[in-house]
């Protein structure tokens, strides 16, 4: 019955709002700031193909935006531009909402580098739809199986340990454990940008992962985060090899292997480091 009502609501919104060019990204997401590092991030899962192409927007030293429901992608780049010019997340979101004739079907959250957070869930977003704003984060969801999803995400984020990726991942997993998207699951994404911007995007990107189409996108995202960390250590190992710091390189290659034991190549580089250091017997 709920699904039938949801379908009727979906159709009525599409007709009455005349927004056929928009896409209904029914999903759950989090925008967050790591107060210690200044890193900004967005994480999201949806039963929609390639959600990472539309929902998450982050700029180092500026802010982060998640735009979903009947998504208007402009909220992402336009929100970041306003925050970069000095506008708070609250004022930036209000400015864009005030100009949007279809704000009733939008769900948007913004956070700026100073920790100001704001979120909007339009009154015609498909139920269950809600958001929770907390200290340095906002979680939001629409078309959920249960109304408890945002609260569960907030609790998980606040009570989890680790870095920003760990905490945002905990929020996504909590949402799924509460029932998640009423339609199922298909894609996920996580983007984290540096708290110390250089102005060079690839240098400022701490993590950028997209699961485009997968039966268990959160499990795959978590796996790729682990592999990402492995290669972060491998890259540090390469750096130390360039500096002829063999012991430091070995430490990093070993950590890489611990994160990604399925990959036989990573121990190989430990052996290479030992040989280059004249420690052939240990290799």
Which residues make up each language-model segment?
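Conserved alpha-helical positions within TPR/SEL1-like repeat arrays
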Residues: 268-272
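Nucleic-acid 5′ end/cap handling module spanning
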Residues: 205-212
């Amino acid at each position: 019955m709920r699904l039938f009502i949801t379908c009727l609501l979906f159709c009525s919104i599409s007709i009455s709002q005349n927004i056929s060019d928009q896409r209904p990204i029914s999903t759950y997401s989090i925008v967050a700031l790591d107060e210690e590092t200044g890193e900004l991030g967005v994480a999201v899962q949806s039963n929609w193909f390639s959600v990472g192409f539309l929902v998450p927007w982050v700029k180092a030293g500026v802010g982060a935006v998640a735009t979903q429901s009947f998504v208007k992608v402009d909220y992402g780049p336009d929100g970041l531009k306003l925050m970069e010019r000095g506008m708070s997340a609250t004022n930036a979101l209000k400015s864009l909402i005030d100009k949007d004739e279809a704000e009733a079907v939008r769900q948007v959250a913004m956070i700026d580098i100073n920790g100001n957070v704001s979120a909007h869930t339009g009154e015609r977003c498909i139920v269950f739809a809600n958001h929770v704003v907390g200290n340095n984060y906002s979680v939001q969801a629409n078309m959920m199986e249960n109304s408890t999803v945002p609260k569960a995400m907030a609790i998980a984020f606040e009570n989890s340990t680790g870095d920003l990726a760990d905490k945002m991942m905990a929020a996504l997993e909590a949402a799924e454990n509460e029932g998640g998207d009423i339609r199922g699951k298909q894609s996920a994404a996580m983007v984290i940008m540096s708290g110390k911007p250089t102005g060079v995007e690839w240098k400022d990107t701490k993590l950028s992962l997209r699961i485009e189409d997968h039966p268990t996108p959160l499990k795959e995202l978590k796996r790729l985060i682990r592999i990402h960390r492995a290669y972060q250590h491998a890259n540090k190992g390469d750096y130390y090899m360039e500096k002829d710091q063999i012991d430091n390189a070995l430490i990093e290659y070993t950590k890489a292997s611990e994160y990604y034991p399925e990959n036989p190549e990573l121990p190989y580089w430990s052996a290479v480091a030992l040989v280059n250091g004249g420690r052939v017997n240990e290799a």
